[in-house]
Amino acid sequence: EKTEQNILQGIDFVKRSKGRWLLGNIYPYVEELTRKLQDSSLIQRAVAAGSIRRMKETVGDVDILVTTSKPEKAIEYFLSLVSYEKIWGKGVTYVSVHTNEGFDVDLRVLPEEVFGAGLQYFTGSKEHNVRLRAYAVRKGYTLNEYGLFKGKKRIACKTEKEVYEALGCSYIEPELREDQGEIEKSIAGKLPSVIPYGSLRGDLQIQTDWTD
């Protein structure tokens, strides 16, 4: 019975993960790419966003945000680092490629002064962002990748913490931004603590043939 349940759960996982990559397989690639971007004199900051930053078990594509005073040169440098089959789109502050490894990588250039707002916008799941923007509207604001606005006046943009707190929320860790009640809990001051990666010391469960 337990084996049957495990098989059914595995089938469900495969269906949900179709067209996606296991985090453990794609993370080293992203880590190396962001390090090379960060090491360039062209780029001030390079951070992976999206499901990579949320540490989802599977990843559909890769989003990387950078700040630079030379967007076009930074984009060309990025293209020199990746092996790609196709460029899906390219602009002054954006490029999207399909890599030879089989997944898409999007690079977005953001102004330094709004990097926090952009990082918040491109990190959360679609559902988290929709709910947060709707909450902002109810409070009389507009929220996008360039900041939190009251009419035409920008209220918050420099850091993610600043954006959340301006909305009356406590800071929500990236791993929690899945629209599973985290916004409501942050407003109420009841967000659960996230175990820091440095606190992990080993595997707490070992599977054997006897567990089936």
Residue ranges and their predicted role:
Residues 1-47:
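Helical scaffold of the NTase/Pol beta-like nucleotidyltransferase catalytic core
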Residues 6, 58-60, 120:
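Short acidic, glycine/serine/threonine-rich loops at helix termini
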Residues 19, 72-201, 208:
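Acidic, metal-coordinating catalytic segment for phosphate/diphosphate chemistry
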Residues 31-71:
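Active-site nucleotide-donor binding segment shared across nucleotidyl transfer reactions
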Residues 48, 203-206:
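Short hydrophobic beta-strand that contains or immediately precedes a catalytic carboxylate
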Residues 63-65, 205-209:
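Histidine-centered divalent metal-coordination motifs
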